[in-house]
Amino acid sequence: MPYIVDVYAREVLDSRGNPTVEVEVYTETGAFGRALVPSGASTGEYEAVELRDGDKDRYLGKGVLTAVNNVNEIIAPELLGFDVTEQNAIDQLLIELDGTENKGKLGANAILGVSMACARAAADFLQIPLYQYLGGFNSKTLPVPMMNIVNGGEHADNNVDIQEFMIMPVGAPNFREALRMGAQIFHSLKSVLSAKGLNTAVGDEGGFAPNLGSNEEALQTIVEAIEKAGFKPGEEVKLAMDAASSEFYNKEDGKYHLSGEGVVKTSAEMVDWYEELVSKYPIISIEDGLDENDWEGHKLLTERLGKKVQLVGDDLFVTNTKKLSEGIKNGVGNSILIKVNQIGTLTETFDAIEMAKRAGYTAVISHRSGETEDSTIADIAVATNAGQIKTGAPSRTDRVAKYNQLLRIEDQLAETAQYHGINSFYNLNK
């Protein structure tokens, strides 16, 4: 039997040069799993806790030796002898060992590393791909990539308020072609920006981070790049935005301060603005359009745009079934962003995806801005037939690692692989 004989964590670096947790799980059969934990820059206040050491003399306080020690000294002894294929039981033990609502004792970064490494070891023992282990034989849907090609907000050092402007190749016949389309548009955008004398350095997620005259100029420039690449905006390629509005929401006056444009808006004015942008550009998805605590604003946005635009809750729902349940009950949003480190275990992650699907919400599997070479989220996207993945631009190895894994999975699935394109938006009246 694949009993766990050793669990070992170490401190490694993520794509921003900050420490993160890597966990290895060994079994008596020789099966092995390794996982690396991502980290966010714009984080929701209700996310599970990521433990940092706080020692300013070491990695500017961002070390994770406390989380590493929690794995090696507290979690590891408790897991010895466990059957590594008992994912639910392992995750439940991790939750109980922590004993807090927000994983604040052991750290979500410690717990998630163990949860993912166990799943990889189990797949290794069974000699099957990770997506098949996690999802079963019916795991066959390749996701539409949501590719962040213009970065702003907390992800870039520029004057753009909206955090992410993305393209979605909904008209592609398969994932391989979707990735090709995205890559060609990415390179087309670089030439468009260069021709305008704009910066073509990239941000945390691989997208370009130029200073622009307005947030709307980002949309105009992307549409120009799509056309220059030979594709049709609105037909073959849709646009998506992640406003990450909590980052420019002012709690004191309850308004949204778009400092890049020198504009201050109320919730209702933000909704009006989004409605105007949707009428002018082929936008199919808006994430965190309002602050995570502005539920009235989110409800208004859903009433106005929820039938024709995917409204994704990230900071709003934080991959948490309690928060998602509240949103479903109150008619807020129609989609959830899934980030494994927001909740801390694979079991809880899959629970959130299931709840979303039962309610007719879509689930978008997502990376974090601080990433690694770990490609687990690519397998999760296929395992759950989620239909959408958000993992940055086709640039930087930490992003491309996920896309390359999806190419491998599509090859493995061969003729059984499916790519639903525009039909991935089953929550909209198309």
UniProtKB/Swiss-Prot annotation:
Its EC number is 4.2.1.11. The modification Phosphoserine is found at residues 259, 325. Residues 1-140 are annotated as: Sufficient for secretion. It is an enzyme of class 4 (lyase). It comes from the Bacteria. Pathway: Carbohydrate degradation; glycolysis; pyruvate from D-glyceraldehyde 3-phosphate: step 4/5. Keywords: Cytoplasm, Glycolysis, Lyase, Magnesium, Metal-binding, Phosphoprotein, Secreted, Sporulation. The modification Phosphothreonine is found at residue 141. Pfam families: Enolase_C, Enolase_N. Its cofactor is Mg(2+). Homooctamer. Component of the RNA degradosome complex composed of rny, rnjA, rnjB, pnp, pfkA and eno (although rnjA and rnjB's presence is controversial). Catalyzes the reversible conversion of 2-phosphoglycerate (2-PG) into phosphoenolpyruvate (PEP). It is essential for the degradation of carbohydrates via glycolysis. A component of the RNA degradosome, a multi-enzyme complex involved in RNA processing and messenger RNA degradation. Belongs to the enolase family. NCBIfam families: eno (TIGR01060). This is Enolase. It comes from Bacillus subtilis (strain 168).
